[in-house]
Amino acid sequence: MDWYSTLIGGLIGFISSIGTLIVERLLNQKGKINLYAKIVYEHQYGKNTWGFWNFEDEIALNVPIWIEFQNLSNSTRVMRNVNLLLYKDGNRQQELCQINRSGDREKKFDFANDGSYSFVIEPRSIQKYECHFSLKRSMRKAECFDEIKLRYFDEKDKEHILHLGSVNGSWEVGDFPRSGEWIKLKK
């Protein structure tokens, strides 16, 4: 009978330790990822902000942007394939091109995470990246757009789409209005 109570006690201890590990893991994953964005001037010359520019005898949409990730959880988070999407009347039109680097060999600058638009965000941390997105007029799929959204995939490959700004996407050279402030991106 003594060995029976020892076995039951050991089994209860084993099950409770597994339960504690499961609860602890769930609590560590609690917490949100917040994304903030700041529209800035392009890196190389510092004179153009987001909008339509003349580029190599063609109009191009350019979005130089700082993106800040705030991981408020106790676990490492993954933000994969961060990109900007164009919308018209709530319908997705197309995605922009992620610019990996600018400059020449002597003055090379890598955007995002050394040219990659996927990020590993450490627990309870804030990380800022300088990114640049672009789309030439000849590559567009729609005549115009009225909204730009940011999209990423998390560590479970779930798609997240957040509103960046409402704009007049008529493909006429000029800058979009910008506040110069950090904005919290929301659905």
Indicate residue ranges for each PLM-predicted region:
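Membrane-aqueous junction of the first/signal-anchor transmembrane helix
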Residues: 1-187
